[in-house]
Structures are given as C-alpha cells and as structure tokens.
Amino acid sequence: MATTIKVAVTQAEPIWLDLQASIQKAVSLVHEAASNGAKIVAFSETWAPGYPGWCWARPVDPALNTKYAYNSLTANSPEMEQLQQAAKEDSIAVVIGFSERSSSGSLYIGQAIISPQGEVALQRRKLKPTHMERTIFGDGSGPDLNCVAELDFGSELGSIKVGTLNCWEHAQPLLKFHEIQQGVVIHIAMWPPIDPYPGVEFPGLWSMTADGCQNLSQTFAVESGAFVLHCTAVCNESGIEAMDTRNGMVFREPGGGHSCVIGPDGRRLTQPLADKPSAEGIVYADLDLTRVVTNKSFQDIVGHYSRPDLLWLSYDKEKKDAAVHRN
C-alpha cells in the first residue's frame, strides 16, 4: 500500500459576500487541485462567503451583517451539494470553511470534511468565536468536539484520519488534545487572511499576525505528530472595499495569504507562493505518512508520552439545545 499522498492548500480570495459565486470558485479550485494529482484540497476559515473582517473595524454593521446572513450556507443546501459533486467527480477530499446559517437564523463558523466519495463525513462549528467574531457568530455545542473523520482513499492509500480546527481553536489546549486523541494524521488548520508582523511597535497582538498564527499551526504539528495544512485566504482591494476595512484592525491593505504545509515535527515543508501575500494560487506537497509513525515513536501525547493516571481529559459531546422537552 502506498504511503505518500499529494495534498493541495488553497491561497485564494473568495467572491466577497456572494455565496453562489464563492462556491463556484471553490469548485473550480477543487477541479484544479485534482487535475494536478491532489487527493485532499483545503480551504480557509469561512472561505464562503469570506471572513467578515468588518467586525474588527467597528462595533456593529447591521447592513453588512444582514447581507452576510443571506449569503451564508445552510445544511443540505444546493451549494453544499455542488461541493459534494465536485469531490465525487474528482475523487478528492474537500475540507472547507464557511459561514453556516442555522434554521433559526443564527450564524456559526462552520467546517465540512467531504469524502472522495462525495459524502459529508464531518460538519462542525467553531466552539467559541474569537473576540469580535462573537458580534456575528454563535457558539458550537457538544457534537462539534468531533473534528476528525476517517476517509477512504481507495485500495492504493486506504483510510486516513483527517481533522480540522478553526483559527484560534489552535490556542485551546484541551480542544487540541481532544482532536489528537481522535487519531488525526492530516490536520487542516483554517485561518482567515492574516497580516504580516510589522515590528515591535505594532500595537496589536503578535499572535494575530501571520508569524503568530503559523507558530500555532506548527505547535499543533509538534504536539500531534500530524501533518498540518496551514490554510489562509487572500483579501485584496475588492475585499477591503466590500467590507470597508481600510481603517480597521485587519484587512487594511491587500494581502493575507500565507498558506503552507507543515511536517509532523513542526518544520515548514513548502515555500511561499510568491513574494507578495496578495498572490492567489495553490500550494502542493507530497506527504510521506511514514513520518507520522516516526514522530509518534518519539512523542505520542495520548499514548506512551502521557500520564493518564495523573492527568486526563473529560468531555461532554451532548448537544445543548435552547428548548428541551422534559416528561
């Protein structure tokens, strides 16, 4: 059985605030990745219909919030079916982030892992939106602790466990531990467009910059011993104009793209797409899965390098609904 799988990490700009157009572009990128031999293609956080960067520019924007809601993806929707069909046609796994609109109208930071057979193998919500994101998105619940799906890549590669988390979920130690104990081998770290670190005088948080976010993805690789597809989007002038973020905390100038592939020991395996983070494209890498086994022999934090007699994780996967019938 083969032990090498080719993966694709997008670094692309969505069609801002336009769900149908963003999904059409995503399908095109899926086909492009598959035509180049990839078996997994990764997209960034809320790639459809784009990350709502205005939440970091002003306290509230009712008009944009409303437009965003109308362009958010719903479960079992035609847009999801388009992605499933593309995955099935090309026999490629699709891991994508999106804004999810629930039946009640609330929005959530959603993720889906679609199998090469075109089935939604996993759909989850970000457990706790980060800071200003909470002005738009709600919290996930118990079932969203599930963040790993076992995908069938056929007789050549067999089954591989693929996992995903959103953005600063990579700063949540217990959540990361929970994913690692699910046996993740290839992890997709979804991030929005992120700006480079401008220097020590920067008034914001280093951990929100490209350097800081990549550091969190690399840390997850070291902790898990898994390959990490570090996926960021791009925000160019069209996004800045659509969201009016030029004077905000993020998305002030074109850029945001810093996608890469990270090995299970934490090293970066790929080069930047171009000199400018505003460049769009796809990062490719061939992953030798035997390296996961090698790293596990040194460090397995849920196995031989753990002390469950002293420290352990307890969790509750029950969904917490707003209305519950009691007899």
Swiss-Prot record:
Pfam family membership, one: CN_hydrolase
GO molecular function, one term: arylacetonitrilase activity
Domain CN hydrolase, residue spans: 5-289
Reactions accelerated catalytically: a nitrile + 2 H2O = a carboxylate + NH4(+); 4-chlorophenylacetonitrile + 2 H2O = 4-chlorophenylacetate + NH4(+)
Active-site residues, as the UniProt record annotates them: 45, 126, 167
Disulfide bonds: none
Superkingdom of this protein's organism: Eukaryota
EC number: 3.5.5.1, 3.5.5.5
Enzyme class: hydrolase
Similarity comment: Belongs to the carbon-nitrogen hydrolase superfamily. Nitrilase family.
Name used for this protein in its record: Arylacetonitrilase
Organism: Neurospora crassa (strain ATCC 24698 / 74-OR23-1A / CBS 708.71 / DSM 1257 / FGSC 987)
